[in-house]
Amino acid sequence: VSSNINGPKTCEEKIIFLIEYLPIIKNDLQSGSKQLVEYVPRFQELGLYMAKNSSVIFNVEVKKFLESCNLVSEDNRNQILSFSSQIIDELKVFTNFLENVLPSKAESTFAIGKETYNKMLKNQFLLDYNDETLWEFGWEEFNRTVAKMDELAKEIDSSKTTKELLVEIKNEYPEPYKMIEAHQYWVDKSGEHIKNNKLIPIPWKERVHVVAREEYLRKTSYYGNFSRSLGVDDEGYFTSQWKINPFEDYWDKKTKDEYLVEHDWGVIIVTAPHETYGGHHIQALYQMHNPSELRKNNGISLFSEGWGLYNEQLMLETGFYPDKKIKLRQLQLRLWRNARVIYDVGMHSGKLSYEDAISLMTDRVGFLRWAAQLEIDSSSSRPGYFIGYFIGMTEILKMREEYKKIKGDQYSISEFHEKLLKV
């Protein structure tokens, strides 16, 4: 609802959407308490947080939209307000169910199990791996990345350990209240790099805005999310949004300090290309313009997230990162994606517990516990999605080498990217 009423659609289209969709939300909330028959503790905690913070959409955002839309009829306005009021009531009932009833049901786990996981690898992702070979590959690549990090750390300062250097790097961050501006600066710089070096053709009038993430979503990811353009906006642009969790005044000192070291210059500079230029923003524009309805309306993490991580590597290869410290941070972020392969297959096939996965992220990758929890939570609810980053990147790099051999002297990296994005 929030994305639609704040998106590029016309006022009339948004009204039609609300009238059609609000009754569905009401029905979903009524059905939810009947469908939830098992208690998964962490899911309950997260669901309760989101339910408690979702009422602002119907209390504030919908009303604000109606005030801004002069074309809405009185009947439609009253209908939308009535549905919103009913949804708020249903949210209260559902919130009470989550808080007081669901914990009394039989406790369960989120793992899909070894057999189902292997079927997913074979039939959904069309991969040759099974849970055992994927687990082995994940650890091999994890250890290889660790070795590269140690080698680079010695070049930077041989008197310090890799961990000590990374702590220093993560303590270099923007002014807390200028996080949006800092992210926007490096988004714009990544766009300039892609265009000036002719790495990927971008034939559309487009832009990316960095904005604060909606409050009700801030506990679902420690960082934020990318919201691709849904079409041409009122100014004639395909405008995407990179939504980040902002720095909050009400936090205690510990929370503020932890937030800042997870929003350092390194992570901003490396993640901007992944999310925007030439990552998700550009890939989404090509997908939107694909003549195949199947390709236009469907995707898979092996390509979309693999493409994002590939762009982090592409920026390393083409000299975007300003110094060796940022390059070390890039390797640490790659290690994070290596770990995603390990904990995804590990948790869902029974090789790792939830706490084992948290420990992998905190002890080996360097995450703070709260950030690791949000990370693992996302994987637990979307089995297989997070392996797409590293596995997808490795497949794209293999294709690039094959394409280079085929084209020989006629090889063009821009042409390769364009052909791949247009498939």
Predicted regions: what is each one?
Residues 1-423:
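N-terminal maturation segment of proteins
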